[in-house]
Design a protein with these regions (language model features):
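C-terminal lobe/tail of nucleotide-utilizing enzymes
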Residues: 75-163
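Bulky hydrophobic/aromatic packing residues
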Residues: 10-11, 25, 31, 152
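Conserved catalytic-core segment of NTP-binding enzymes
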Residues: 20-21, 25-115
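Charged catalytic carboxylate motif
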Residues: 11, 65, 145-148
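Flexible, glycine- and charge-enriched loops at secondary-structure boundaries
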Residues: 2-9, 56-60, 139
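P-loop/Walker-type NTP enzyme "switch/lid" segment
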Residues: 1-24, 128
């Protein structure tokens, strides 16, 4: 009974459980903020978390903080959370990106996805047109990068589901 739920996280989980069997995956996309109740509730209700991280110091700090929260939560026996990953976005060929990538590899290990999303004007254009990048720029490097991310994500999810 939804009236007996004690928190918004429980409320979200209750409604997700009502439709969970109807879908292979339910994706909750939240804004990337440090102290968002929406983000906290989404993580609490999630089976898996993918953390996109822009290659800058502020985003790195936020991503590491979110990753840490998720790691702690995944160790709680009451948690549904089974997998966590981080994907680098807005990647360019600059020194700052290389430095960020190396720090992420060192801190995150296998949680860091191999697939990366490059910085591209096609992404802004896609957002403006309300069309997914994988359709609007499918032959461009950024479109192929999103396809590679999907394949890697699917592979990781399949492995986690087997266990």
């Amino acid at each position: 009974d939804p009236k007996k739920l004690s928190s918004m996280g429980d409320f979200l989980l209750y409604f997700l459980n009502q439709v969970r069997d109807d879908y292979d995956y339910i994706i909750i996309d939240t804004q990337p903020t440090r102290d968002s109740q929406i983000l906290s509730n989404a993580i609490a209700a999630a089976d898996y978390v993918l953390i996109p991280m822009q290659c800058d110091a502020f985003s790195e700090d936020s991503a590491f903080r979110t990753y840490s929260i998720c790691s702690k939560l995944s160790k709680d026996p009451a948690s549904r959370l089974k997998g966590i990953g981080v994907v680098l976005t807005m990647v360019d060929k600059g020194a700052a990106t290389r430095e960020t990538r190396e720090e992420c590899k060192s801190e995150l290990g296998s949680a860091l996805f191999e697939a990366e999303i490059p910085m591209a004007l096609a992404v802004k254009s896609s957002v403006r047109k309300c069309v997914p990048v994988c359709y609007s720029a499918r032959t461009q490097p950024v479109g192929r990068s999103y396809a590679a991310l999907y394949e890697e994500l699917k592979e990781r999810l399949d492995k986690l589901e087997e266990n």
